[in-house]
Amino acid sequence: MQQSTDLQNLLHSVHKKSYPAYKALKGSYPFNNYILSIDHVQGDPFASPSHISIRIPHKTAGFPKEYYKDSVISMTLSDYLARQFEKQIVHYTFRAKGSGKSGLISISHCGQEVLKRTACEITEKEIIARFFIGFPANGRTINATELEKILFDFLPVCVQKAFLYKNTNHQELQAAIFLAEDQTCIRKQLSSGNLVAFVADGSILPRESGISSRPMKDSVPFISPESLRVTMTLPHKGEISGMGIPRGITLIVGGGYHGKSTLLNALELGVYNHISGDGREYVITDDTALKLRSEDGRFIKDVDISLFINDLPNQKDTRCFSTEDASGSTSQAAGIVEGMEAGSRVFLLDEDTSATNFMVRDTFMQEVISREKEPITPFLERAEDLYKKAEISTILVAGSSEAFFHIADTIIQMDSYHPVDISEKVRALCGKYPLNPVKASAFAFPTSHRIMKKQAPSIRSHGRNAGRPEQLKIKVHGKDGFLIGKQDVDLRYVEQLIDPEQTAALGLLLKYAIEKLADDHRTVADIIEILSGQLEQNGLSFLSGGSYISCGYAMPRLQEIYSCFNRYRR
């Protein structure tokens, strides 16, 4: 391995040369407390910045061993360190001058949720931080003097302050670790307490705005109805009380603007841990919960939707259904079946974003259009079977139909952001307004059919590499999806994707599956099972192919991996 003095000598040797000469810097160099690696050098000062990583041995970093004891605590520490490093580099970014992205220093920006990111990874031996630096230039002429400032003056200070335990705020870090342990404890108690979600008293659910996930100031704190209040004992916070949502079918109702969707939004993001001060730190949902909605125009391939749709006029087989342009009802049926395959134990639905004809058929409509002429079995007629036979609970926001009141186990009315348990009151009313007997066909578990097709690589038609296979490239469109090769994967309605870095990771996972796992025999479920094992064992690093993985990727849940792969048109 070269020494840091070798890096200085290289910098002096490339100073004022043409920008591509920076490529000579690629390699690893030991500094006092860490090893600096220049993994990828940008092509010019206006291109995406260079990829840098540093490795700090645990002995040097000095963090307590108990902070590495399990995956959740390790992820919390990684998240904390990435946030601390970002706080340090903000003082130095663009302090080195030049053209284009010269002087940029950046790392993943962590939001309100705690995610496992490639920006900071903890292994058995070391802490690895990955970030970006814009190598300075004047025009397209190397300015190595400015890069030397970044690597030898700015960076060592940032590393010392962010990644050495002796320089961190011990109390703040311990509070983050303790919060994560308390959140894990609540998740465990959901299962043992026959609950699907918990919302602590005092939680702040409304957000600052539609483009901000920070808590709204002066909003109404959440207070549980007495009949749904549960008390949990946590290892650090001690006793905490709040609303426990039982397994089964839960209905959330209330007038417009009273907080129904706000509660549902908090529950759908309760699959993630939140940082202290977010207001939703103790809003915890079963981590397999899946938000579902209709998605007009969605691609569907070989999905068994016969649980909900049968006897189509064109005689199309709904046990292995495909379409390039799904209707709202068909897309929602497919989403539920795909969610079952992904192992979801809770479905979250909002009437506002659901297909009306998929959710319910009222008595009058049943009289006008007889059952034998209607191919759709509405969700209303399957929700109880989903719980009793498949052990999948439902939380539904509703406001326009009486029908769901008759099958709900728990009914919560939101009244000026205050939840009220009206279950008993509604049961008394249901006797006055009886529902027609359900005539749905027998419940049968859907069967997975979809085989992932092996894709022949495109062949370059011109240039010096003509005749060689083209590399499958990915272009990420924020949280909305990505372009892989020439195909768009649309993820706009996968609502529990919260960070563009998760979308980027999904692109890498799909690319790996296409190139390494698709063989015209494995199903999507088979492929995701292989990927899941790799992710659990090696994290996202296994996607590097023996090279390196950069900053800019965050771990998606298994449910979002399924959602992504099922939207890929192969």
Residue ranges, per PLM feature:
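N-terminal accessory targeting/assembly segments
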Residues: 1-185, 189-194, 205
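N-terminal pre-Walker A segment at the start of P-loop NTPase domains
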Residues: 206-241, 276, 284-289, 293-300, ...
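Conserved P-loop NTPase nucleotide-binding/switch module
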Residues: 340-383, 387, 400-406, 410-428
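Terminal-proximal interaction/regulatory segments of ATP-powered molecular machines
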Residues: 490-570
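Flexible beta-alpha connector loops of hexameric P-loop NTPases
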Residues: 298, 311-329, 361-376
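Conserved P-loop NTPase
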Residues: 414-503
